[in-house]
A protein has these predicted regions:
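PLP-dependent class I/II
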Residues: 1-201
Length: 201
């Protein structure tokens, strides 16, 4: 893939808070635009220019992301080991969460591929949907609030992202430590089983 107008049109994003670095709360990122004509690129740059630039720490972080230690640098070995450990840990956390979600009644979850989140789909019982509607609440919000109240686990209801009507999802981060993930999946499993039993049709 090249950068000419005849190439595939693609806009790619990366940020330090949502990359494998996991620097949550830090603000810094980039956008790469390829395969668009000059007029489209000009408009994209115009819109991007309306935003304030990252603060100094965000700019420093992006500089480090774009220019990490290289073979031969004094810090390369420790950088590579830490990076590899982070990637392995994230992979194991994601796998544990996906396996747990897929083992639960009415829940399906695709494998996480390069994201810091998983998006399980939940088939909620009609009684749960009715209880949510009685509270003038979306069913996935109802589920997420019950989860938070029961376990302290916070997830983001899928309805904030838009979803096919009549389907329910939530977003769950995989950035916790491996030790915490084991506790989270245990609590989540216990909550979900009790929730499904309480609202069984």
């Amino acid at each position: 893939m090249g950068y000419g107008e005849g190439d595939i049109s693609l806009i790619s994003f990366h940020s330090v808070s949502n990359g494998y670095y996991g620097e949550c709360g830090r603000r810094g990122g980039y956008m790469e635009v390829t395969g668009f004509n000059s007029e489209v690129r000009k408009q994209v740059y115009k819109v991007a220019s309306l935003s304030a630039c990252s603060n100094i720490s965000g700019q420093i972080l992006m500089s480090l992301v774009m220019n990490p230690p290289k073979v031969g640098d004094e810090s390369y070995t420790s950088y590579r080991e830490e990076r590899d450990d982070i990637i392995l840990s994230l992979s194991q956390c994601a796998e544990a969460m996906v396996q747990t979600f897929n083992s639960l009644e009415g829940v399906t979850c695709s494998k996480a591929e390069g994201a810091m989140f998983v998006f399980p789909s939940v088939r909620l019982p009609k009684k749960a949907i009715g209880a949510a509607e009685a509270m003038n609440t979306k069913p996935d919000v109802f589920y997420a609030l019950r989860l938070l109240e029961s376990t302290g686990i916070a997830v983001l209801p899928g309805s904030v992202f838009g979803q096919v009507p009549g389907t329910w999802h939530f977003r769950c981060t995989i950035l916790q430590s491996e030790e915490k993930v084991q506790l989270i999946v245990y609590r989540f499993k216990s909550f979900h089983e009790a929730f499904m039993e309480e609202f069984r049709d």
